[in-house]
């Protein structure tokens, strides 16, 4: 039995097209590492996925799980970590498509370093924090480095250690991804690094993310796994691209990178609320 599970979440409201896009990319791009593909049917209820969904997986070796709790993706991933028997897990959301041969091997390789807790295809400095006091307590100020959880890899043991509360709204999901006690900050709190991995196979520390050409920069030419947000940037006009890039990296990305906490080695290098 392979010690790595690739977990692809299939969300019922998206219909079969998203799964068909993922499967086409999965067939075309060898993962580069032995694994088991786990398809999580989310929100299908009884009687489960229809013929078009099932047909998309014809000829693809996979195992199926069913998740029908009314939560967003991250609690479902936490449930998968409890359910599956594997040493490492790679999670790909419903909108994901893989873009390069060896994509899984690239995400897994940095995890061989005991100082690395998680890798992802993209990261951002964005913070939704505002002047509202309650929100200020929930999110660090910009720059707020965090892995985007559209595509990420982590050991099962670490995944099971982390807190995965039941979240049912987009703001709560953003907080679990990028908030003060979100995924990245929980990993940092254990003294571990979070790295973005590019199509070039190179891992990038948070201070390098804006130069990695993976998310809303550098024509995204080094992107390993695409999703709806990377496609949004690809398809945007120049004005919208500029706005989206500022949201991710600020008006001066180099200055933001110099101020950004980096995690690992005991956690952030500056106070998260500074």
Spans of features found by a protein language model:
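A conserved hydrophobic helix/loop-capping motif in glycosyltransferases and polysaccharide synthases
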Residues: 4-18, 40
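Short, well-formed alpha-helical segments that are part of the catalytic scaffolds
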Residues: 13-30
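Active-site-proximal specificity loops/subdomain of glycosyltransferases
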Residues: 45-84
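Short beta-strand-to-loop acidic/aromatic patch adjacent to the donor-nucleotide binding site
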Residues: 86-97
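Conserved catalytic core of nucleotide-sugar-dependent glycosyltransferases
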Residues: 97-181, 185
């Amino acid at each position: 039995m392979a010690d790595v599970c690739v977990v692809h979440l299939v969300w019922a409201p998206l219909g079969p097209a998203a799964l068909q896009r993922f499967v086409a990319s999965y067939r075309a791009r060898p993962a580069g590492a032995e694994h088991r593909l786990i398809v999580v049917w989310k929100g299908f209820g009884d009687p489960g996925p229809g013929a078009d969904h099932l047909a998309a997986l014809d000829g693809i070796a996979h195992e199926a799980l069913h998740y029908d709790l009314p939560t967003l993706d991250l609690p479902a991933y936490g449930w998968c970590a409890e359910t599956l028997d594997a040493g490492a897990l790679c999670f790909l959301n419903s909108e994901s498509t893989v873009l390069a041969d060896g994509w899984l091997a690239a995400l897994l390789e940095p995890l061989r370093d005991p100082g690395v807790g998680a890798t992802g295809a993209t990261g951002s400095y964005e913070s939704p924090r505002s002047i509202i006091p309650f929100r200020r307590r929930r999110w660090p100020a910009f720059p707020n480095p965090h892995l985007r959880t559209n595509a990420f890899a982590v050991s099962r043991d670490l995944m099971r250690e982390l807190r995965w509360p039941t979240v049912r709204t987009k703001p709560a999901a953003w907080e679990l991804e990028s908030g003060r006690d979100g995924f990245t900050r929980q990993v940092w709190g254990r003294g571990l690094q979070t790295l973005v991995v590019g199509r070039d196979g190179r891992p990038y520390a948070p201070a390098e993310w804006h130069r990695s050409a993976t998310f809303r920069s550098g024509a995204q030419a080094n992107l390993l796994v695409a999703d709806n947000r990377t496609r949004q940037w690809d398809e945007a006009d120049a004005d919208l691209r500029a706005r989206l890039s500022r949201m991710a990296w600020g008006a001066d990305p180099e200055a933001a990178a110099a101020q950004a906490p980096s995690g690992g080695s005991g956690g952030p290098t500056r106070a998260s609320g500074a």
